[in-house]
Every structure is written in C-alpha cells, then in structure tokens.
Amino acid sequence: MSLHLHDTATRTMREFHPRLAGVASIYVCGATVQGVPHIGHVRGGLNYDVLRRWLVHNGYDVRLVRNVTDIDDKILTKAADAGRPWWEWATAHERAFESAFDRLGCLPPSALPRATGHITQMIELMQRLIDKGHAYAAGGDVYFSVASYAEHYGRLSGQRLDEVQQGESTASGKRDPRDFTLWKAAKPGEPSWPTPWGDGRPGWHLECSAMSTYYLGSEFDIHGGGLDLVFPHHENELAQSTAAGDGFARYWMHNAWVTMSGEKMSKSLGNTVAIPAILQRAAAPEIRYYLVAPHYRSTIEYSEPALAEAISAYRRIDSFVNRVRQRTGEVGHGTVPAEFAAAMDDDLSTPQAIAVVHNAIRESNAALDRGDDRAANEAAASVRTMTDILGLDPLSEQWADTRGADDAAHHALSELVGSMLQQRQQARAERDFATADAVRDRLQACGIAVEDTPDGPLWTLKDG
C-alpha cells in the first residue's frame, strides 16, 4: 500500500503523488508569536513532524517550511501592555516556540521564515493581483476582491459565497464586505513598511502565500495547519495564490484541536496548558506520546488521567527497550512490520501504529521470559525503528540533546529504577521472592510504585 492522505479540499482520501519524484514539499502554518506556547499550539507541529519522518523513512527528500508570524495586532497589543518593543516581544516568544518544538523532538524545519523578512515578496504578490484585477487599493489599504474570483472562492472550506463576511465594514474602504485585507495602512505608532500604495503592514493571509511559494515554488505538495485555519485563512490563501496564477498546494491537511472541557484550548478562554508547565510534570517524550498517539484528525480532550495514561504507556516502551539493552547488549534499528507500515500509509493512523509497537513489546517480553535473547533484541530493534518514525525512540540522541535539567533527572532516575527492576525480575525468575520483595520495598520507600503488567514491570512516582 502507498501513502494515502485525507485531503481537505476534496474531502477524500487521496494517494500521495509528489510533484517531483522522490521529493516532498510541505508548508506548515506556524505560530503567531504573541505569548507562551501551549500544547494546543505545538500539536500540529508534532503531527507534521511525524508525516515528515514517515516520508523520509520511505526515501523521500523532504523540504518542510514552517513560518513565523511576527507582526500581528495581538503582538502589538501585548507588547504595548507589557511596555516592550513589539519586535522584542515577538523575538522572545519565537524563541519560546522553537524551544518547545526542539524539546518535544521536532526535526528542525528546512526553513523558518519570518513574515517581516518577506515584505518584498508580499508586495510583488499584491502587484500581480492588482494587475490581474483581483485586488485594489483604498485609503492605503489593499484588498482582495472576492467577487472577481467568485467562481473558485469557497472550494476548500465549502463556504457559501453569500454567507461570507470578512470582518471590516465597507466604511473601511472595502467595495464588498466579503473582500479581505492584503495590506493594512499604517497607523500612528505602529511599525510599517513602504509600498507603492502607502506605508503599512501585511495582512495575515498574504504572508503565508508569499512565503510558501518563495521557498517551495509556485506549486508544492502539502499545505498543513490546524482545523481552525480552514476558513478564512487557508481559503483566502488559496484564493489569492491561484488568482495570481500559482498552482499552490496539491494536498491540504488539517490537524484537530486540543480541547479542555469541550472547548478549544485558547489563550482568550484561559484554558491552556503551557509547555513549560507541563514539562514540570512529565518528560518531553511522554508529552510527545500524548500528542501524537491519537490520530491527527481526532480531537484530544485534555485531562490529567489521559495524560497519566500516556505517560504510563510511554514508560512501558522506555522500560522495555532499556530492559532488553541491559539484558542483551546494544539495541540497533530493525525492520518495520507490515502492519505498522499499513497503518502509517492509511492517513498516518498513529493509534494503530502504536498498537503494533505495544504488541511487539508484549511478544518480546515473552521472548525474554523464555530466555530467547536474540528474538528479544530483534524485536527491540524493530520497536526502536517504529518509535523513531514517531519521534519517540527512547534511545534517540534527540532526547539527550534537548533534555533540560528536569528531563535529565528523569532519565537518570529511569536508568536506576530500570536496573533495580531488572534485579527484581531476575530474583523472581529464580524464585527468590525475598530478594524481589526487598527490591520492591526499597523502591516504595523512595516514593516509587511498581505495577506488574503483561508488558513487564511499570514504575510510577507516587503522589506526595
């Protein structure tokens, strides 16, 4: 089976055929760097990182571009409220976002363009649209004329043209309330850049069209982003890009939200879980597991029990790989089972793929119990390869390179506890239950609870 992806534009599963053989080009809408990143922000970046890893595993040369929106109304407002320059505020939070992606194991993007670094490309795109009759200037603003492209507008989102309303009233200079802003005229005290139509700053939609085609060409393979971006952002991107003559994206992918109490996680609602805060409660790979284990098009309803379940599941993988390494020596990389490949080719069905991982662990633990170290090592090597595709390989250098002080402490603890549990398992195998119980009691005295499961012993830190 070859890779099939759910395409938002056609609302169907489509077989992936890249524009250029052996090359995959991906543009992902990144963050508006207005504040501290939360788990809802980073979910999409992790999902598209898994897509990238799967494509690389299958031999593709992948070029992934993720933008940074570093000029926006919210950035200006928050910077002013904090008494800081807007650019300083944006830069600080851009670093926070990149640190979050790095700590959660995202491969660095091929390019990480900032909106403010591509004003020239935006001006060129606006000029093309004006020349073709699809945009117009009014009072220093520049607008896209939806009526001029009515036959094609709405094909991504399914939005009816007679229901479209794009915010500002016609009093702002718009000819039609459906038209959307490409360029905003300068206001006193705000940053601005010169254009043939007056000083100002870019509109949100214009930025992504200019940057994606600049780095990936006028037509590229996959455009990704959150479900909330389908309309108006991606609809407007598609309209302005194709109206200008670009082929633009061949496939559209959208990841679902992280919610809390049924509502999308959002700073405006005050229901977010910040990355720095959650990293105090769980190790980085455990958080990544929590966010990539569900299907990317399925909503994640955040709860502490669900997070705890994900932590336990990842620790089973971590404990297993380290148990095999301690027992059999170095664990390399192995083959990918057909069931895992089939799951990943089916629109990145990570729940099924992870089920294959846990099945392999159960079989390998059985091999260890019967003394078949060779089979156990081969299975562990396969588990390493599967988890590496998901960005979850417990032995990956990415965790050593990105681990902060808290993660380093957890890793050291994991190694020590794993060694003690191996001693306990050996004692139980030799029916030396007194020694096994003594090891368990020592761990419990240190605040570590041990649970014997079909996948092997699982340890957790006790509350309090």
Swiss-Prot record:
Q: How is the cofactor bound?
A: Binds 1 zinc ion per subunit.
| Enzyme superclass (EC) | ligase
Q: Which domain of life is it from?
A: Bacteria
> Where is the motif 'HIGH' region annotated in this sequence?
31-41
Q: Which cysteines are joined by disulfide bonds?
A: none
Region described as Disordered: spans on this chain: 160-180
The residues that the entry says bind Zn(2+) are C29, C208, H233, E237
Entry annotated with the keyword Ligase: yes
Pfam families listed in its UniProt record: CysS_C (PF23493), DALR_2 (PF09190), tRNA-synt_1e (PF01406)
Tell me its EC number(s), please: 6.1.1.16
* Keywords, sorted A to Z: Aminoacyl-tRNA synthetase, ATP-binding, Cytoplasm, Ligase, Metal-binding, Nucleotide-binding, Protein biosynthesis, Zinc
Q: Which cofactor does it need?
A: Zn(2+)
Subunit structure, as described in the record:
Monomer.
The protein's name in its UniProt record: Cysteine--tRNA ligase
* Gene source species: Saccharopolyspora erythraea (strain ATCC 11635 / DSM 40517 / JCM 4748 / NBRC 13426 / NCIMB 8594 / NRRL 2338)
Biological classification of the source: Bacteria, Bacillati, Actinomycetota, Actinomycetes, Pseudonocardiales
* Gene encoding the protein: cysS
